Amino acid sequence: MKYMQNGSFQNQSLMKLTLMLTLVFLTGFWITNFALYFAKMNLTPQSVQDYFLGSEEKYKMPRTFQSMLEVTHSHLPMIGLVVLFLTHLLIFAPYKFKNKVSIIICGFTLALLNESAGWLVRFVSPAFAWLKVTTFIAFQIMLGFLITALVIFLMRDSTPEVNLQTANQRPKPKNNKAV
C-alpha cells in the first residue's frame, strides 16, 4: 500500500502490471453484466416484472425464493469485493476527498440497491421495477467509471514495463534514519 500512497507504484512495473491485468478481468466482468442482464430483461419495467413475477403470455414462471436466495448469496460477496477493490484503489487517485467519499458511497449504495431491487419487485411491489432498471444503469455507469478512472490513473506518467532480468529482484529499501 505504501507504493500506492506515495505514488511510487509508477516505478513498480510488476505492481502496475498486476493491477492492469486485474482491471482487464474486471472489464470482462462489466461486459458480461450487460450480457446477463439483457439475456433476461431489457430496460423496460414490464420486462423486469415479467422476469421476477412471471408472465402467462410468455409462459414464464415467477422467480422462486430459493433461486433468488442462491443468486443473492453469490452476488453479495462478489459485488462487495469488486466495489471494495475498485473504490479502494480510487482512494489513491488524485481526486478531491469529497469526490472520493461521494464515489465510494455511490458505488456501494448502487450495488446494494441493484441487488435489492429484484427482491422488492418480487415480494413487495411490481412498482419497484423502475428501481431495478435505474440502478442497473447507474451501477454499470459507476463500474465503467471506476475501471476507466483507474486505468487512466495507472497509465499516467509511464506504462508498465517488465524487465524479465530484474522482475524477481526486490526494490532496495530506502535508508530512513530517525531524526
Regions found by a protein language model. Name each.
Residues 28, 108-119:
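Aromatic-anchored segments of alpha-helical transmembrane domains
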Residues 84-107, 170-171, 177:
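Cytoplasmic juxtamembrane regions at transmembrane-helix boundaries
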Residues 13-43:
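N-terminal signal-anchor transmembrane alpha helix
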Residues 62-81, 90:
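Individual transmembrane alpha-helix segments
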Residues 18-25, 103-111, 135, 139-142:
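Hydrophobic alpha-helical transmembrane segments of polytopic
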Residues 46-62:
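Perimembrane loop-to-helix junctions flanking transmembrane segments
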Residues 1-15, 167-179:
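N-terminal juxtamembrane cytosolic/stromal segments of multi-pass membrane proteins
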Residues 116-174:
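Alpha-helical transmembrane segments of multi-pass integral membrane proteins
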